[in-house]
């Protein structure tokens, strides 16, 4: 059947004759130069029901899809089940994390077992079958490299469960009746349902990974399915196991990914999944990823034009703990004058938490030079941030040696700390599962089951309660809020990794920091906790909201995709209205986040940077992800030089530590470091700044912040108060200073006794 107005019956007969003449051409069809220019003008609508008449295009096939579908309802179970080369072990439905063995992330889906070579090479569809087993990367359903327009299905329940939602690891929102549900779900539960991927070029398909529906309330997954391929979306060839259709074993629960590799690779443009059975109490719903190698096509200008390449000579692979340590050592040997490797503590399993320092004087704090840090891997399965930081360290070293003026200036004027893996225990667990089979949560938590991202003390509540009682800043400061004693006790549920980070941040006077996370494309800034306790989402700004907005935008706007209005959402949230940025509390509330703790307990302004929709992309995607984030990573580091900086000294020129720097109109102060130097992040404008310290007279200045990069110098010299001078003189001569309140009380007592 052809579309009305698209072809005459005579032309259709000619095409049919050409197709039948190609049967048995022994693969010559793949060399047909007309293939590359053919238009799929006769393609049926994507959501139409497959017609049995299509089988007339494939007379050599023993049974077409339509015939098989007519027989299937009479059988209680599929007659044959394929033995998967990489089947995940069976687990209970409540199993939280899958541990598929031997799935190293830098060898994604590479190891295979032998299987029978499929028969039936004589067919009308131009499909090539390979004898040699080959491993191929994912096509990119999870990373969104495959667009929504390339996904099609027979039927859908509703738009929110359309084919475009059938992506591996896609997450549903809390409200599952909106446009953002967690799978493709067929409109009917029968054997004629399918979901299809158009690769838009010849591709060597090698495997399929499936999941059930992501849902808090429903249990839906496919337990077995067939795989079909086509070059024109009309004539389909089912993957065979000998002489019969191969039935692949699907999922046994809804979250653990299951891999099935094809017995032999199939070369085609389209691939279709046809569910054969599903969970008894559920519906036909699935998420998936396709493994395939696009074939070179010199005639296709579109693909050549859109290929992402990088010129940076970096180590684009996933590194386990040992390899990460070795890479750090190599970088240190390449750039010994600007790098230093150290550790901030140990994980629960005893793995050292290594960091790389980059500075022209590594190992020491230079007066007047700001400190910056990047952290990644708080969630062990969010691997992209870890690899981006390892790439960043290599890049900075190479560019410094090449005397790149921008990088040289950054290194000489900034002390940079890079902590690529805060949760190495979790990462090793995710690394063992691999990039595609780890699911959404394998390795997220520490070894003792703690989520580091919300394991810091909740200082927000302490501050807000004090503000409600009007005790700020008289009794409770608006900054440097002390950690509660219960949190410091050994019995507190605090991860070893969390304690290590807190000690690290208290030791080094960080000014700006970014913690890299995954699963979204957005930059989140504090506060992360809502102020209204009965709400789960509420815009909760800090006193420095305008500064945080700029810092977030500086990263998002220089990222290749974050502010692209044409890109689709990763899962459920559309952050384009805020230009790729979001206030953490207005997104979802988190108590005890690193961002809030850093802002309220230290001088550091911390933001969460979500660098990709795919938490654990295949290593073949790392060059593209590096290109997406490279400029952003550098620009964000440069923001540490925005605002004002200076020294607070006494009349003898000695730096005053812990002096308070206040900015009029901003209810959040910072303090000077041990040498009396300070850095205050501010947007361009004129500010009234006050420096004060115990025992000194406060000093106020007008400080101007310009638009050019580089902090404005604003120094203060404080003189001691009269009482401080008296105390100093009396201590010098060995006498105790007079306590005026005590003396007044003594005089009053004497007067009472005299009257009595």
UniProtKB/Swiss-Prot annotation:
Single GO cellular component term: extracellular region
Basic and acidic residues biased stretches: 68-78, 113-131
Chief place where the protein resides: secreted
Residues in F5/8 type C domain copies: 134-293
GO molecular function annotations of the record: metallocarboxypeptidase activity; zinc ion binding
Disulfide bond residue pairs: 136-293
Protein family: Belongs to the peptidase M14 family.
Pfam families: CarboxypepD_reg, F5_F8_type_C, Peptidase_M14
Chain positions carrying an annotated carbohydrate: 231, 241, 281, 337, 491
Official protein name in the record: Inactive carboxypeptidase-like protein X2
Record keywords, A-Z: Disulfide bond, Glycoprotein, Secreted, Signal
PROSITE patterns: CARBOXYPEPT_ZN_1 (PS00132), FA58C_1 (PS01285), FA58C_2 (PS01286), FA58C_3 (PS50022), PEPTIDASE_M14 (PS52035)
Keyword Signal applies: yes
Signal peptide: 1-25
Gene that produces this protein: CPXM2
Known function: May be involved in cell-cell interactions.
Annotated Basic residues bias: 79-90
